[in-house]
Regions:
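Beta-hairpin "wing" of winged helix-turn-helix
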Residues: 77, 108-109
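PLP-dependent enzyme catalytic core of the Aspartate aminotransferase-like
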Residues: 98-102, 111-141
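Hydrophobic residues in well-ordered beta-strands that form the structural core
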Residues: 32, 106-108
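Conserved PLP-binding catalytic core of the aspartate aminotransferase-like
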Residues: 57-58, 68-102, 125
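Short acidic/glycine-enriched loop/turn segments that link adjacent beta-strands
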Residues: 6, 80, 113-117
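Residue-level detector of flexible, active-site-proximal loop/helix-junction positions
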Residues: 29, 83, 113
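PLP-dependent aminotransferase class I/II
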Residues: 1-69, 74-77
C-alpha cells in the first residue's frame, strides 16, 4: 500500500497458470519509465515509514466502516483497501451532492452488480475522515 497506482506501478502474486493467462490473454504489463522505477525504489527504501502510514489507513478504515454501518440506509462492504465502498441505494445521488457541496470528494460509482447506488470514499487523514463522517451524520441524523 505505497499509493503508487497513479504511477502505474504495482505487482501481483499468483500461481503460474493465472499469471500465464493474465500475461497472454487479459493484459500486458505497462512499460515503466525511469521516474516510476526510481519512485518504486524510493518507496521500498522508506518501507518503515510506509508501514506507519498503512497502520493509520487500517485504523481510519475501521472507524469509517463502523460509523457508516450505523445507518440502516447504507450497505457497507468489508474492505482491505485504502477506500471503503458502500451502497447508499436510492439516496446515493443526494449523498454525493451534499458531500460535494461541503467540498468533500468521494467517487460516485452507481450500479455495481446488484447494488444500485455505490459510493467510494478514500481513506484520508483523521481530520478529513472526521469531516466526512460529520457531514454524513448531519445529512442522515
Amino acid at each position: 500500500s505505497f499509493g503508487l497506482a497513479g504511477l502505474r506501478l504495482g505487482y501481483f502474486i499468483a500461481n503460474k497458470k493465472f499469471t500465464d493467462t493474465f500475461m497472454n490473454v487479459l493484459q500486458y504489463p505497462y512499460p515503466l519509465s525511469t521516474i516510476t522505477i526510481e519512485a518504486g525504489i524510493s518507496a521500498l527504501e522508506k518501507s518503515k515509514l510506509m508501514n506507519g502510514a498503512v497502520d493509520v489507513i487500517k485504523t481510519e478504515r475501521k472507524r469509517i466502516i463502523e460509523n457508516l454501518r450505523k445507518y440502516d440506509s447504507f450497505e457497507v462492504f468489508d474492505s482491505k483497501a485504502n477506500f471503503v465502498l458502500f451502497d447508499a441505494h436510492g439516496s446515493y445521488k443526494r449523498v454525493f451532492a451534499a458531500l460535494a457541496e461541503q467540498g468533500i470528494s468521494i467517487r460516485k460509482l452507481g450500479k455495481i452488480g446488484n447494488h444500485e447506488g455505490c459510493l467510494r470514499v478514500s481513506i484520508g487523514t483523521k481530520e478529513m475522515n472526521s469531516k466526512f463522517l460529520l457531514a454524513i451524520r448531519d445529512l442522515l441524523g
